[in-house]
Amino acid sequence: PRALNSFRDAFSIWHENHPLAEPVRITLPVPPGTDLSRVHVYRHVGGWSRQDTERSASGLTIETRRLGLFQAFEDRHAPYLNVTSPPPNYHAQTKRPILTARVADAHSGVNGFGATANGEWLLVAYDPEHGELRWDRDEDLNSGTQNIEFWASDHAGNVSRKSVTVVVP
């Protein structure tokens, strides 16, 4: 992926359509002392796709049933996050206003998400098909000014936070 840092050269293992009866484990060695906290192995199939990656002192290991082109990339980019409802400094008409945000991560993928109102957790659902976080509106918000904060993290540990102020009746 263009926006990711290439960790080392790509490596090709056999042909990508070669059938495998059982999954194989592939380990990519790394220099001792390398910080691997944001590094994953990606497989190229029409585009780069993150593979579940085990990290150890000896290297990066994946288990796969498909061979082909692999490369390690470091993801230092936080997910895209944008509050879509309500607008800033919104004066709500109800104690359960609609609270939504758009989220996407084109690199290692969305791994975690949440929202709070003045530090109190809100029950939030994530719709990956539409890239949307939505408060379930399961209980009333407290009256007064509420700082609503959405957050999202990716598989590399990068985190985005966005907030909006809502005045609740």
For the regions a language model picked out, list residue spans one by one:
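Long, low-complexity serine/threonine/glycine- and acidic-rich segments characteristic of extracellular
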Residues: 59, 106-169
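Short, surface-exposed beta-strand/turn "edge" patches of beta-sheet domains
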Residues: 44-66
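Short, solvent-exposed loop/linker segments at the N-terminal edge
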Residues: 18-20, 89-95
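Proteolytic processing hotspots in large secreted/extracellular or virion-associated proteins
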Residues: 1-45
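Proline-centered linker/hinge motifs at extracellular inter-domain junctions
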Residues: 76-80, 86-87
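Extracellular Ig-like/FN3 beta-sandwich strand-entry sites
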Residues: 65-67, 96, 143-147
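C-terminal beta-strand-rich structural cap/linker in extracellular carbohydrate-active enzymes
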Residues: 61-78
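Short edge beta-strand/loop segments characteristic of extracellular beta-sandwich folds
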Residues: 25-31, 98-106, 151
